Every structure is written in structure tokens, then in C-alpha cells.
């Protein structure tokens, strides 16, 4: 396959630059870090909820229930503080998603997705 000169030059220029100095790479790394932090926070939140649920589920009467809640005030405070924070967070909008000019890397993302059945299914489900 013969690569057009413009595409060849763009790819050659991209390959010469240090990846860690590329602005698009830096933006994607920053977004990755943000999403990993969010995943860790949510996993911790779910773990705390499950822990409290199991403790409450093992109570046999009202007094035990009240005792479990009293013993776990810090956990309850943490759960409701985090839950309130999650409710205040706005869900991802298009402004939050880094916009990369994929054409400068000679990649037509729509064609790439259309050629891959798994990616196309994810795209149609709204997950891409």
C-alpha cells in the first residue's frame, strides 16, 4: 500500500517526537489518572456499603441494629459523605472527554470502529 506523502510526513514527525512531550499524550495520561482515582473511590465506597450491609444483616433485633449503627458512626459518616459527593458530581459530558485530532496521526477513527465488530457493538450501545 502506498502511503500519501502528507500522511507519511505526519507519521514521521510524530515518531521523531518524544511521546512524553506530546500534548495529546499528556492530556490522555491526565484523564487516565482522573478515571483511575474515580474507580478507586467508587470501589472503596462499594466496599464500605457492603461491609455495613453485612453487619446490619446479621442483627437479630432492633437493639442490635441500633448498636451496630452506633458502633459504625465513622463508617456511616464516610459512606454518606462520599455518597453526597457522588451525587454532586456531574456525570461525564462531552466537555470532560479529551478531544484528540486523530487525523494528524492518519487514523480515521470512524472507519476503525466500523471495521471492528466489538468496537462497533460498544459504539452502538453508547459505551464508546
Swiss-Prot record:
Keyword Cytoplasm: yes
Compartments it resides in: Cytoplasm; Nucleus
GO cellular component assignments: ADA complex; cytoplasm; nucleus
Keywords on record: Cytoplasm, Nucleus
Main location class: cytoplasm
Highest taxon above the source species: Eukaryota
A biological-process GO annotation: regulation of transcription by RNA polymerase II
Miscellaneous remark of the record: Present with 981 molecules/cell in log phase SD medium.
Protein name per UniProt: ADA histone acetyltransferase complex component 2
Organism of provenance: Saccharomyces cerevisiae (strain ATCC 204508 / S288c)
Amino acid at each position: 500500500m502506498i502511503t500519501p506523502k502528507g500522511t507519511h510526513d505526519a507519521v514521521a514527525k510524530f515518531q521523531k517526537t518524544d511521546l512524553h512531550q506530546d500534548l495529546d499524550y499528556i492530556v490522555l495520561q491526565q484523564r487516565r489518572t482522573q478515571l483511575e482515582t474515580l474507580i478507586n473511590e467508587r470501589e472503596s465506597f462499594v466496599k464500605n456499603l457492603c461491609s455495613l450491609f453485612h453487619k446490619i444483616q446479621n442483627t437479630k433485633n432492633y437493639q442490635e441494629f441500633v448498636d451496630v449503627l452506633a458502633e459504625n458512626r465513622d463508617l456511616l459518616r464516610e459512606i454518606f459523605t462520599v455518597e453526597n459527593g457522588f451525587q454532586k458530581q456531574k456525570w461525564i459530558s462531552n466537555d470532560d472527554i479529551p478531544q484528540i485530532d486523530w487525523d494528524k496521526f492518519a487514523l480515521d477513527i470512524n472507519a476503525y470502529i466500523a471495521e471492528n465488530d466489538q468496537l462497533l457493538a460498544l459504539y452502538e450501545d453508547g459505551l464508546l
